[in-house]
Amino acid sequence: MKNQEIHLPTPNPEHPYGGGNGRYRFPDINGMNLLGDNISLPPIVPKSFHIMLTVFHPETLYGMKKWLPFCEDLRKQYKHTPTPVEYSILLVLQPPPIEGDVPAFTQALGDFPDFYMKTNSLISYYDQSFVRRRLSLHKKAETAIVLLDGNGNIIWKDDGGFTVSRAEHLKVILETLSPLAPRTRTH
């Protein structure tokens, strides 16, 4: 991975979702976390990064769970740096709500004893095609992993489940963008 080039999206000031600064912005989505609190994503936390594990069907949550240990390691590594890394799981379901959606979501994620995950897992009923368009995803995409800056702008994204190469690519991007990033050893 070290010899590969890092490809970040080129800002486009004419992009309709750019907000004038040329960056693609993650859509503002409201929903409920696993504690029953209404929250909005993406969080706006300047000088930080946020990984959005975005899922469009409860069945695909099982595959996205493989990202959780990797994201938790990144969160711990960057916790005491000037550019902390946080993460969330976002389940975007097509409205109207169907009875059993929330239990299916919690069952798919497992019984989280972890307050962080209960707080940062969001279920939302939103137009899936709109979210896919905003993320420039294929119209049938089931998942996306999206790296955001502290203002909710998209830095990098990929669609699909966890692979070592995707994880390494994300790690290299974070190390490149965060000048005081913790350096990790690769075995």
Task: Label every model-predicted segment.
Residues 50, 60-114:
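Structural microenvironment flanking redox-active thiols in thiol-disulfide oxidoreductases
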Residues 1-27:
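N-proximal helix/coil linker or "cap" segments that precede and/or mark the start of modular domains
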Residues 51-52, 145:
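Hydrophobic beta-strand anchors of alpha/beta hydrolase catalytic cores
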Residues 4-6, 32-34, 160:
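Domain-scale activation on soluble regions of proteins
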Residues 29-50:
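A short beta-strand-turn-helix
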Residues 9, 96-141, 173:
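Thioredoxin-like thiol-disulfide oxidoreductase module
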Residues 132-133, 140-187:
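Thiol-/selenol-based redox modules, centered on thioredoxin-like
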